[in-house]
């Protein structure tokens, strides 16, 4: 039997598992603060509340990715409105974070982020 030298390459290399966004993103103070809040919620409160999200990715995963991709202000509003849409009479199903936001989503009009989802924007 061979021993593992710790250097995996190729197809057999183990991949780190994370339920959160793993692409590279700018580590600004606002983004780090927002993603840290989401991660704190995932580790502590989420286990007490249980699996109650009606979407995929879950609302906390969505908020984490939205903040990582689009910053604390835009991503925070997107995450907030996603949680609001997740109620009993709200939406459900696959609803990923859009890769790019349309130019009509201005920072001073956060109510427009209500309709912000990849399926609605088409990206």
UniProtKB/Swiss-Prot annotation:
InterPro entries: Membr_insert_effic_factor_YidD
Function: Could be involved in insertion of integral membrane proteins into the membrane.
Family of this protein: Belongs to the UPF0161 family.
Keywords for the protein's UniProt record, in alphabetical order: Cell inner membrane, Cell membrane, Membrane
HAMAP family (alphabetical): UPF0161_YidD
Claim: Cell membrane is one of the keywords in the record: yes
Region annotation Disordered: where it falls in the sequence: 1-23
Keyword Membrane: yes
Any one GO CC term of the record: plasma membrane
PANTHER family: MEMBRANE PROTEIN INSERTION EFFICIENCY FACTOR-RELATED
Membrane protein topology class: Peripheral membrane protein
Phylogenetic lineage: Bacteria, Pseudomonadati, Pseudomonadota, Alphaproteobacteria, Hyphomicrobiales
Protein name as annotated: Putative membrane protein insertion efficiency factor
Protein species of origin: Brucella abortus (strain 2308)
Pfam families to which the protein is assigned, alphabetical: YidD
Location of this chain's protein in the cell: Cell inner membrane
Superkingdom of this protein's organism: Bacteria
């Amino acid at each position: 039997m061979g021993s593992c030298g710790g250097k995996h390459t190729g197809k057999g290399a183990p991949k780190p598992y994370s339920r959160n966004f793993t692409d590279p993103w700018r580590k600004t103070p606002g983004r780090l603060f927002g993603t840290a809040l989401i991660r704190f919620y995932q580790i502590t409160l989420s286990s007490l509340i249980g699996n109650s999200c009606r979407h995929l990715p879950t609302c906390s995963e969505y908020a984490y990715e939205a903040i990582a991709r689009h910053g604390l202000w835009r991503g925070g509003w997107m995450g907030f409105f996603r949680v609001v849409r997740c109620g009993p009479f709200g939406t459900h199903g696959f609803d990923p974070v859009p890769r790019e936001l349309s130019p009509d989503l201005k920072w001073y009009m956060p109510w427009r982020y209500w309709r912000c989802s990849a399926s609605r924007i088409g990206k």
